[in-house]
Amino acid sequence: MKIRGLLYAVVLIMGASTSAAETLLQRGDYLGNGIVACGNCHTPQTPSGPAPGMEMAGQFLVEEKGLFKAFAPNITQDKKTGIGGWTDQQIITAIREGKSPDGTIIGPPMPIGLYRGLSDRDVRAIVAYLRQVKPVNNEMEKSTYQIPLPPAYGPPVTNVPDIPQTDKIAYGAYLAGPAGHCIECHTPFVKGRPDFANQLGAGGFPFHGPWGVSVSANITPMPMALPIMATLNWPRSYAPASDRTAPG
């Protein structure tokens, strides 16, 4: 029993050391190609999959009649049509605060309200990953909005700590919220914004693409998301600033 306990302790220590030894780029590669899935929006899609040689080069995303027509911008290292000329801090500000270097506010479906909760280390890791994406010259159309965009999504974001991976519920909420933004696509939109307050995770968001139209599924254990919302207090934790006064 003592030997078994010692081996278990060694495994735990090795696991912790491996996690601590993870480089910023390794973490960024995991986030960018995994849970954050930058390419899902920013890489052009064809009926057979991602367009070859166009990683992160931008594409048409979605049009919500009377609300907005959204294009995912080119986020490759191309200095003319991408973000190659942006500083690291400008990229971080765009991701977590929804503001481009020229002061333009980034609108939906970019999940700024959730990305505000990305930890400092994770957002730096995403930048490290984006820095090694090859430049692609691809000028994208600008998104247009018939709904008013806020002057800001809240105060500047600073000092967001990592969520301990040992806290399974908190880390799971972080992955489903700020990092993976599962709830962004799986929550119905009301007046151009996801209805986190009343329909968290209830599905119903349409996606238009070469395949036709698909609709996000209800990922709650009940028809509506209120039981989960009450447990995790999502609106106050991760919703856009304008939604944080919603009852929770």
Regions found by a protein language model. Give the residues of each.
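The canonical Cys-X-X-Cys-His
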Residues: 28, 35-45, 91, 126, ...
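Detector for the c-type heme attachment site
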Residues: 41-47, 96, 111, 131-132, ...
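Electron-transfer interface patches adjacent to heme c in soluble/periplasmic c-type cytochromes
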Residues: 58-92, 113-123, 198-244
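Positively charged n-region of N-terminal signal peptides that target proteins for export
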Residues: 1-5
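Electrostatic cytochrome c docking/interface patches
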Residues: 17-33, 48, 150-177
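Bacterial N-terminal signal peptides
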Residues: 7-16
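Extended, well-folded interaction surfaces typified by the phenylalanyl-tRNA synthetase beta subunit core
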Residues: 137-149
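Ligand-binding pocket scaffold of soluble enzyme catalytic domains
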Residues: 23-25, 88, 122, 129-133, ...
